[in-house]
């Protein structure tokens, strides 16, 4: 089972008040419901999902709030993944339910925006967002390369209303048009964690946080190792260049042309090619000097080597 499925299963097991149940159901029906009209039968509502736990949640919320006759069907998808599709059907009093959920208007128009009666209270807003996530939400497991949570909506005005609702909780949610619909999305790990907590997925939030912390620690260690490796490569490269320049001087003009202080450090560098500048400074017979002092003397040797390569005469010490 995927991380998103685990989160949704947890959400379907939450205990809620009647008002919260209504807000959650309103989102589920608005986003996953299909209305049909037939002569002699009136209005029928089908709410479909591929998740059995969500289907049970829809069924139980409808029974709790309305106690209308309900049917539950299971069909097999014929395209791509041949998953089961669960359909909760309301054949009687569908119009009454849709009006009560503020989905169907007085003139039989579909209401895509959110009424303050349904989401004005903070707990109701949380419940509606929970229903929206159950209906059209997905989330990457934090172990994957990127953090991403999204909720798909068919209609732009409802998607914008969801964004505004989420951002009442400072989640920095954004919207994007997709083929055949619109999405609300979040990519900041802290905001995704806050959203999971907000809608009641406490276990999911804790699992997300655990994985995120481990991932961030690994990334920090990798950055540190990469930085240290780069510094080591830089140090090794500098040491090789220094040794090459000293040996070049030794072959061409001899190290005796160097001032005593430079000659001393040149001989130590060639003899001890693997030690650090600090260690070189501690080996000097004339007395220890700092890392920056050693670096300064080695740069002087590099400059003298370049002058010799250029044909300049070097006065002996």
From Swiss-Prot:
InterPro entries: Homing_endonucl (IPR027434), Sporu_reg_WhiA_N_dom (IPR018478), Sporulation_regulator_WhiA (IPR003802), Sporulation_regulator_WhiA_C (IPR023054), WhiA_LAGLIDADG_dom (IPR039518). Residues 276-310 bind DNA. One of its GO terms (biological process) is cell division. It comes from the Bacteria. Pfam families: HTH_WhiA, LAGLIDADG_WhiA, WhiA_N. Keywords: Cell cycle, Cell division, DNA-binding. The keyword DNA-binding applies. One of its GO terms (molecular function) is DNA binding. Coiled coil: none annotated. Belongs to the WhiA family. Involved in cell division and chromosome segregation. This is Probable cell division protein WhiA. It comes from Exiguobacterium sp. (strain ATCC BAA-1283 / AT1b).
